[in-house]
Swiss-Prot record:
Gene responsible for this protein: guaA
InterPro entries: Class_I_gatase-like (IPR029062), GATASE (IPR017926), GMP_synth_C (IPR001674), GMP_synth_GATase (IPR004739), GMP_synthase (IPR022955), GMPS_ATP_PPase_dom (IPR025777), NAD/GMP_synthase (IPR022310), Rossmann-like_a/b/a_fold (IPR014729)
Coiled coil: none
Enzyme Commission identifier(s): 6.3.5.2
Name of the featured protein: GMP synthase [glutamine-hydrolyzing]
Pathway per the UniProt entry: Purine metabolism; GMP biosynthesis; GMP from XMP (L-Gln route): step 1/1
Function statement: Catalyzes the synthesis of GMP from XMP.
Residues that, per the record, bind ATP: S223, G224, G225, V226, D227, S228, S229
Residue ranges of every copy of the Glutamine amidotransferase type-1 domain listed in the record: 5-195
Amino acid sequence: MNKETVVVLDFGGQYNQLIARRVRELSVYSEMLPYDTSYEEIVAKKPQAIILTGSPASVHGGEAPGCDPRVFSLGIPVLGICYGMQLMAEQMGGKVQPSSLREYGRAVLQLTGKDEIFKGLPDEMQVWMSHGDTIISLPEGFRITASTANCPVAAISCPQRRLYGVQFHPEVRHSTYGMDIIRNFLFEICGLRGDWDLSDFISEAIEEIKNKVGKKRVLCALSGGVDSSVAATLVHQAVGEQLVCVFVDNGLLRKGEASQVIDTFAKEMKMNLVFVDARERFLAKLAGITEPERKRKIIGEEFIRIFEEEKAKLGEIDYLVQGTIYPDIVESGTSTAQTIKSHHNVGGLPEDMDFQLIEPLRLLFKDEVRLVGEKLGIPAEILWRQPFPGPGLGVRVLEEVSFEKLEILREADAIVRDEIKKAGLEREIWQAFAVLPPVRSVGVMGDARTYAYPIIIRAVISEDAMTAEVARLPWELLDIMARRIVNEVAGVNRVAYDITSKPPGTIEWE
């Protein structure tokens, strides 16, 4: 299929996948490529435009990532964002240096000249900044089009060559007119139509899976969560009875989750489902382990070992399906992005794994996964389940995991989710869950001294898990949760509410 394509060159910045997502929201297909992708490979993609992303690096650093400068001479529009703008300026003859006035967070942008990229926008607007360098000398043919109080060169352009740069991050929602800026770039400057939607993704993914798998059999790691459910359904549409779904109860699931998965997929959706009770096995492997990364890798490796064992029972199976999505890949790090945490769907897999992977959702964000699921006819009660980490409660029981701690957390978590549902907030809250820290505190219950665990409630609002704001739950709701937890869950005498956004925190504690 010939479709409009925007290539996003990834330099490792925190928000880079959001850029690709914003472009897709405007019905234009975007594809992320590593910053060092060859000029020939970029040309082979036949892009209508190129976007250069942000980066944690500095353009004047010794190992600054760069792209082939010939991309600026392709004759197609290029938009540089943050580091991308500085790189464009540096590679085309300008100069960048560290700034004495760094900018992190909200800033007020003032337009200093007319430009197509700001068409129809006010002269003053809020933007989101994250930079420590600044352009001090422009390349020939460029002009300054916007500034802030601390950044005299906040946007540049060379309209004759259709080269544009912004120092801020239009892809982040905190930039009030960010989507309008991206829209202007795509439609006013690039002249695109917007000819891509998720129906195209589904048909292409199904065709790709068919071609890859052929007549071979496929094993799906089914958790019952949104991602694995959509991945399983997509693969099932591609290969039908060649797919075998394996559901592993690792003892790290939420209350009632195992029975719900069996009822939904085996009984209602009629999928070929193999159930494995591995609760004791996982707990034995996790005994004495306190470091989060080790827990994640142990859980990921044990999952694979179980699937390999099931493969041996089932006969010849060559492929393993996983519900890996874009944020999993981002947080696991790229060559230029720092690793925040490894995901068992990505960095936690053993090197000697006896499968080839199929990850049909690896280019999608959570909201896109749900839209695909709707198009595939998956029930809403599955699609709107809150995200649940692959390692499950194993990374919500902080430090060492034990049966006792898991039971405490399972009950507390069920109360949190129950009250969110009763309050009608299920679709407003991205995630709401309980965390069990490895400390105990003194309390008093029934005139007696207690020494028990606290429970931390975590609730956030997000669109894509890349950034998240703390959910401002009603005080009355928090009070109900706290009273229920301390009264109904043995071993708990205190409840706290986590009010940290992402960044600086991650959504999960481990």
